[in-house]
Regions:
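Catalytic phosphate/metal-binding cores of nucleic-acid and nucleotide-processing enzymes, i.e., regions
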Residues: 2-196
Length: 196
């Protein structure tokens, strides 16, 4: 049976419904969420192995996104949280396949500073920074880094960990938190809980 003109599958809303129900899109979304959860677990395991007081946020954004419990919004922010000197700082974990020049620069030089924004470290340089050792840093202008600003602004995080397949993680520390995370591990790799 035919449809009257203007009704049926040529309507934008009908096309959107079909697009939403596409099983391949559903599989892709599930796969992305699963890889994101696995990456969060790996970052959690790595940071706790360094002796840092990191804990997971339950449902990592699930309750916050639905807005079911507005009173818990601040407690449910970020993927991971770390407590230093009785203050909680947020860690956002992002696993991506996108290529960004500044990430590749950080991988090649070890550490770079996006002026007025954040510092990016490879894992070995990040550990040196946590222990208070000096590090060489390449200066970069804050241009074309909107994607990284979004990562920090998502939950107002102080630390963003970027993971890519077959590459080492990049740890991005917001300028406002540089003093907080610096020298929180002693020379033996033990956590030092700074008191303000």
């Amino acid at each position: 049976m035919g449809h009257a003109a203007g009704y049926g599958m040529d309507r934008p809303s009908a096309r959107r419904k079909l697009k939403r129900r596409d099983p391949n899109r559903v599989k892709l979304g599930k796969r992305n969420r699963r890889s994101g959860r696995n990456f969060e677990r790996n970052v959690f395991a790595r940071l706790t192995s360094l002796g840092l007081p990191v804990y997971k946020v339950p449902m990592s954004g699930g309750l916050k996104a639905t807005g079911l419990i507005p009173q818990l919004k601040d407690r449910m922010a970020g993927d991971l949280q770390i407590t230093i000197a009785d203050k909680t700082y947020l860690i956002e974990c992002k696993h991506t396949s996108a290529k960004h020049k500044v990430v590749e620069l950080a991988e090649s030089v070890g550490a770079c500073h996006i002026k007025g924004f954040c510092f990016m470290f490879t894992e070995s340089d990040f550990i040196n920074y946590l222990m208070g050792y000096p590090y060489n840093c390449t200066e970069v202008e804050d241009e074309r880094h909107k994607w990284l600003h979004k990562y920090f602004d998502q939950d107002n995080s102080q630390l963003v960990v970027i993971g890519r397949n077959y590459k080492q993680n990049i740890y991005c520390v917001h300028e406002s938190a540089m003093e907080v995370f610096s020298h929180i591990l002693d020379k033996n790799g033990k956590f030092i809980n700074k008191r303000s």
